[in-house]
């Protein structure tokens, strides 16, 4: 989008620059994934066009309740190898992005190279969100469960199994 603006010689105002920069941070998980030199150049362009850092932080704020809820769920995680964590949620129904956020947060912890979050996302559907810092190809693991994605970010949706059954299948695949 920034390249398009540059081609048109369009100078976005502060609000547009701020919103675009906030979107970039969301899309790249705070410049931690899917980030290239062009990503940083686009961010610099938006900063030069007066992206408001304070407003951006306000736009990206999450509620205290959501933060505390996610951290309570993260407490359920455990290590299955020296560098792989799994978090199995309770039987409540969660949004898929909640599972992804937990896996992303687990990757910020020391010694965790891959993280998997298992949770119910529909009445009869269990989802797995898989994230890796590169040491594990989570796409291959998720493909074995009829899922897909990328080497460092993948997911699967499974029907007809319990959380415990999905957890056991996942552990078997990881330990292969």
Regions found by a protein language model. Name each.
Residues 1-23:
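A short, charged helix-loop
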Residues 21, 26-176:
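Hydrophobic helix-and-loop "lid/oligomerization" segment in the mid-to-C-terminal part
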């Amino acid at each position: 989008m920034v390249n398009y603006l540059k081609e048109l010689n369009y100078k976005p105002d502060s609000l547009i620059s701020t919103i675009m920069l906030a979107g970039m941070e969301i899309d790249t998980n705070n410049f931690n994934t899917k980030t290239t030199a062009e990503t940083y150049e686009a961010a610099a362009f938006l900063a030069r066009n007066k992206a408001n850092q304070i407003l951006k932080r306000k736009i990206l704020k999450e509620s205290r309740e959501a933060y505390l809820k996610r951290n309570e769920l993260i407490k359920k995680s455990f290590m299955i190898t020296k560098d792989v964590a799994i978090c199995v949620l309770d039987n409540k129904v969660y949004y898929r992005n909640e599972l992804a956020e937990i896996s992303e947060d687990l990757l910020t912890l020391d010694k965790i190279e891959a993280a998997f979050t298992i949770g119910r996302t529909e009445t009869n559907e269990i989802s797995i969100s898989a994230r890796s810092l590169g040491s594990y190809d989570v796409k291959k693991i998720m493909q074995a469960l009829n899922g897909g994605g990328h080497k460092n970010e993948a997911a699967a949706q499974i029907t007809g199994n319990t959380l415990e059954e999905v957890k056991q299948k996942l552990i078997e695949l990881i330990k292969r």
